[in-house]
């Protein structure tokens, strides 16, 4: 990663649009976007948090609330998360000015959170409609005093490495499509009011053949591994990668998506650092009785996993060999 930004690069970065679509001149091109710290934190610090803020973040169960800017309408996007969740992750693993990458940006919540926190961010999505949604939300949340860049790109996640220098990304954060979890009719068994607008509907991201949300678990896991293996070199050493996933029930069996992803990303070179529980009990309404009295099943809608990985640091022996080669 470069130690400084040239004047020409700074001018170029300020001219970047908030959205890039297939066919645009910048599509498939390396983005000249700033990725360096703009804070005065010590070089060894991993974030700008105070000691008090750090202590609060050590608790391994997190709760969040939605705010007015959040999108909760599933007809707009089938799987959203609060801005406050994205802000927590970004604050914990980046400094001001650094670069955040969301490989499956969806409704653009990551971009809004990064903008609030003076971080640069780029999000990718297959669907032009979601990129348009991101752009609209960014324009509604514009801040004339914020000099960071937020960009949504219509692109397959498999092609993301074309857009960045190696080692330029400080955080990869996303809530990806959840295999074929949403690609089936809703039965609302866990809802007290089952006969609502969601009953019988398929709340899917798309039916694009490249969409991870239509894949069976084994194929989904391998495809996620292929994508994240290509993303790993974009992270600087000790740069974090956080993935929000639930598990699912299918034909009376728990499908442990989070376990599959942990094992797959470990095989691809990532190191698991933490597992955090997102406690959703404060934002879930109308839960009905489920499984009583013969089959105890935890309510999947009440919690999800935040899987925290990082790019392992380069061993000192390798650094010494590299220094000797350069001399």
What are these regions (language model features)?
Residues 1-327:
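Class I S-adenosyl-L-methionine-dependent methyltransferase catalytic core
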């Amino acid at each position: 990663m470069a130690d400084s930004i040239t004047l020409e690069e700074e001018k170029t970065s300020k001219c970047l649009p908030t959205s890039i679509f297939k066919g645009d001149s910048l599509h498939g091109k390396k983005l000249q976007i700033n990725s360096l710290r703009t804070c005065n934190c010590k070089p060894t610090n991993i974030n700008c948090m105070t000691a008090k803020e750090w202590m609060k973040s050590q608790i391994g169960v997190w709760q969040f609330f939605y705010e007015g800017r959040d999108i909760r309408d599933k007809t707009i996007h089938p799987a959203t998360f609060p801005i406050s969740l994205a802000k927590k992750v970004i604050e914990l693993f980046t400094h001001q000015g650094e670069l955040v990458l969301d490989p499956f940006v969806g409704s653009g919540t990551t971009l809004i959170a990064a903008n609030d926190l003076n971080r640069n961010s780029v999000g990718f999505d297959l669907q032009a409609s979601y990129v348009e949604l991101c752009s609209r939300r960014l324009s509604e949340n514009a801040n004339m005093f914020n000099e960071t860049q937020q960009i949504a790109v219509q692109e397959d996640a498999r092609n993301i490495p074309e857009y960045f220098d190696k080692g330029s990304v400080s955080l990869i954060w996303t809530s990806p499509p959840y295999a074929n979890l949403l690609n089936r009719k809703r039965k609302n068994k866990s809802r007290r009011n089952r006969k609502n607008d969601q009953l019988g509907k398929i709340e899917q991201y798309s039916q694009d053949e490249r969409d991870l949300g239509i894949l069976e678990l084994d194929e989904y896991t391998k495809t996620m591994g292929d994508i994240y293996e290509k993303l790993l070199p974009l992270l600087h050493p000790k740069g974090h990668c956080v993935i929000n996933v639930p598990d699912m029930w299918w034909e009376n069996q728990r499908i442990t998506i989070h376990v599959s992803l942990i094992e797959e990303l470990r095989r691809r070179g990532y190191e698991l650092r933490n597992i955090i529980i997102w406690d959703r009990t404060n934002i879930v309404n109308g839960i009905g009785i489920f499984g009583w009295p013969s089959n105890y099943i935890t309510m999947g809608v009440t919690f999800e996993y935040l899987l925290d990985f990082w790019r392992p640091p380069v061993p000192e022996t390798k650094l010494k060999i590299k220094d000797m080669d350069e001399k």
